[in-house]
C-alpha cells in the first residue's frame, strides 16, 4: 500500500498546518525549539521532520549534528533548500521510520512530533529506545482527541483528507507504559491548546542511565 504522505504536496501540507483553523505549524516549531534549549543535545534525531520546521532553533555551539527522517523525498529537498549551509551537520534520511536504520546509542535527543499517530508506534518505540544514548531524551508530541473537531481538520487543502485512513490516536497511558518497558521513564508532561478546540499532549521521557 502506498503511503498517503507521498501524495501530499508540500504547499498543501504547509498551508494546512499554518491555516488559522489548524495553527499547528508554529506551535510544533516552538516546541522543538523549547526541547532543544532545555535538553541541550549534541546529536539530535527528528522523526517526520518534513521541511524542517523548528530547525531554525538549533544552536550550533551546542548541537553538532541533526538527523531528519521523512518518508517524502520532496519535503527533504525543500528542507535542504531552506538550510543549504547550516552551521551544524545536517543529515537527511528518506524512508519509513519503522524500517530505516537508526543505529544504537547514537542520539542525545529524539523528537517525534505528530508521528506516532501515523505509524505502528509500538514497533517504532523500541527502535527509538535503542538509538538513544543512556540518559538521552525522547520528546513526543501527540494530538489529543477533540469532541468538537475531527482528527484532520477540514481546510481548503483537500489532499490532507487522504491522511484520515492512516491517522490513529495514541492512548497516553499505553504510551507511558510501553516506554517504561523500554527503559524510558516519563519526566514531564504538558498540554498545548490549539485552535478549533484541539490540543497537543507533550511527553518527555529519559532513558535509563547505565
Task: Please place each PLM-identified region on the residue numbering.
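Core SAM-dependent methyltransferase catalytic element
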Residues: 182-210
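A short, conserved alpha-helix within the catalytic core of class I
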Residues: 118-131, 140-142
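Class I SAM-dependent methyltransferase SAM/SAH-binding core
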Residues: 43-100
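A short SAM/SAH-binding and catalytic strip from SAM-dependent methyltransferases
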Residues: 108-122
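A short acidic, Gly/Pro-enriched loop at the edge of an enzyme's catalytic core
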Residues: 98-110
Amino acid at each position: 500500500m502506498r503511503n498517503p504522505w507521498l501524495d501530499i504536496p508540500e504547499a498543501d501540507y504547509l498551508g494546512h498546518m499554518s491555516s488559522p483553523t489548524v495553527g499547528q505549524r508554529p506551535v510544533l516549531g516552538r516546541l522543538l525549539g523549547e526541547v532543544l534549549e532545555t535538553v541541550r543535545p549534541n546529536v539530535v534525531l527528528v522523526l517526520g521532520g518534513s521541511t524542517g520546521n523548528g530547525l531554525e532553533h538549533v544552536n550550533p555551539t551546542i548541537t553538532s549534528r541533526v538527523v531528519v527522517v521523512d518518508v517524502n523525498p520532496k519535503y527533504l529537498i525543500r528542507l535542504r533548500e531552506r538550510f543549504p549551509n547550516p552551521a551544524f551537520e545536517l543529515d537527511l534520511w528518506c524512508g519509513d521510520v519503522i524500517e530505516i536504520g537508526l543505529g544504537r546509542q547514537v542520539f542525545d535527543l529524539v523528537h517525534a512530533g505528530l508521528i506516532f499517530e501515523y505509524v505502528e508506534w509500538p514497533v517504532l518505540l523500541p527502535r527509538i529506545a535503542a538509538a538513544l544514548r543512556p540518559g538521552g531524551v525522547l520528546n513526543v508530541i501527540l494530538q489529543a482527541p477533540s469532541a468538537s473537531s475531527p482528527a484532520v481538520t477540514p481546510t481548503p487543502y483537500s489532499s490532507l483528507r487522504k491522511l484520515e485512513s492512516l491517522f490513529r490516536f495514541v492512548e497516553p497511558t499505553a504510551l507511558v507504559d510501553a516506554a517504561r518497558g523500554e527503559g524510558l521513564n516519563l519526566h514531564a508532561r504538558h498540554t498545548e491548546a490549539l485552535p478549533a478546540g484541539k490540543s497537543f499532549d507533550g511527553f518527555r521521557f529519559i532513558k535509563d542511565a547505565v
